[in-house]
Regions:
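N-terminal export and membrane-targeting signals
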Residues: 1-11
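Bacterial lipoprotein signal-peptidase II cleavage site
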Residues: 6-7, 16-29
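Residue-level detector of alpha-helix boundary/anchor positions
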Residues: 12-13, 81
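Compositionally biased, intrinsically disordered/low-complexity regions enriched for serine, proline
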Residues: 20-23, 34, 54, 58
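Short, solvent-exposed recognition patches
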Residues: 38-102
Length: 135
């Protein structure tokens, strides 16, 4: 009987304590995410522009996001005659794509896909442009 009284008292105390708490305020709470965190503000277009400014070949840039992104889950895609710049919403998504696609370079959420004629020296130069943009 005494154990039953102790249990009932504990349940009542717990109910009283939790009942005295304020309900959460409406809207987003501190520490909660309302969407994917923004990794950086670097766009595919800005990367292509920086590549051109560095003297690298980026002829015929065209937005191919509508064609490529639904299948590979990117958020931006600019293709040139030599390199394609893909931007993903997360680093994990970029890593997944780059890991499954030979001949790519990945830094954070950006992936470069090189054309067959791009030399090793030019690949390194393209990669340096991306790394600089992400600083």
């Amino acid at each position: 009987m005494r154990a039953r009284v102790v249990i009932v008292a504990a349940v009542l105390a717990a109910t009283a304590i939790t009942g005295c708490q304020r309900p959460p305020a409406p809207g987003p709470q501190a520490g909660s995410l309302t969407g994917a965190p923004i990794l950086n503000t670097v766009t595919a277009q800005a990367v292509v522009r920086d590549m051109g400014a560095a003297g690298l070949p980026v002829a015929n840039p065209r937005d191919v996001a509508k064609q490529k992104c639904p299948d590979i889950k990117c958020i931006e895609a600019i293709e040139t005659d030599t390199v394609t710049v893909l931007v993903f919403s997360t680093t994990g998504a970029a890593e997944g794509y780059a890991g499954a696609t030979p001949g790519t370079f990945q830094a954070m959420n950006i992936v470069l896909q090189f054309g067959p004629t791009v030399t090793l020296a030019d690949k390194t130069a393209y990669e340096q442009v991306v790394n600089k943009a992400l600083l």
